[in-house]
């Protein structure tokens, strides 16, 4: 029985890795071994940063809400507590959007939170 070296399958596998490494600098897009290492590392970075992105956006929203809340004489934590007491359930993404694009609506929410905190 003749020896099978798996030429077609191996070549396809290597071509797939080199295609994924397109745009990498230097030998990282030319040499299979180096390209494979970089593709694996890139996959790890992508996996990690898809989760990191969620944390980064939440931090950005909180920063924007805090800045707008302080313009109304409240801290972020007191604003959120006041909104919870008044039964207003608006998520941080929407609050941050209001703080940037519709400050009057945000000010109304802040006033409602203040009213609950002063009770």
Curated annotation (Swiss-Prot):
What keywords is this UniProt entry annotated with?
A: Ribonucleoprotein, Ribosomal protein, RNA-binding, rRNA-binding
InterPro entries, from UniProt? Ribosomal_bL20 (IPR005813), RIBOSOMAL_L20_CS (IPR049946), Ribosomal_protein_bL20_C (IPR035566)
Q: Which Pfam families match?
A: Ribosomal_L20 (PF00453)
Molecular function per GO: rRNA binding; structural constituent of ribosome
Looking up CDD domains in the UniProt record yields: Ribosomal_L20 (cd07026)
Domain of life according to the entry: Bacteria
Q: What do the Gene Ontology cellular component annotations say?
A: ribonucleoprotein complex; ribosome
Kindly indicate whether the keyword Ribosomal protein belongs to this entry.
yes
A biological-process GO annotation? ribosomal large subunit assembly
The record's comment on protein family reads: Belongs to the bacterial ribosomal protein bL20 family.
User: According to its UniProt entry, what is the function of this protein?
Assistant: Binds directly to 23S ribosomal RNA and is necessary for the in vitro assembly process of the 50S ribosomal subunit. It is not involved in the protein synthesizing functions of that subunit.
Protein name as it appears in the record? Large ribosomal subunit protein bL20
